[in-house]
């Protein structure tokens, strides 16, 4: 996992270098499901200036993609961070985006206990990713 996180951080450093040279901001692609579960690399793909999809579930992202005319091959491709061959988000997390979306939307009655436990654990262990670095109080 540390190798995959390193790759994400190197990729983000490259993106920021290009953005800085061109005077651009870096836009992230994380959605509500990924943010809730912490399915992003701290200071990697999570290190961006803007996160326009942050309040959209994965389902809503797909709906927007269809409405915007994004090619079906892209929409139907299994979500993957692309950090190693054959990797998919859902296999790595052990649950589906449909289940995560249901939790994010408060539809807990639709989520089997096994999936709830996985999603709650992912949320709990990734809490540090959703906050800026802690600083001591000023004395």
Positions of predicted regions on the chain:
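ATP/NTP-dependent adenylation/nucleotidyl-transfer catalytic domains that generate, transfer
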Residues: 1-9, 13-16, 20-25, 29-139
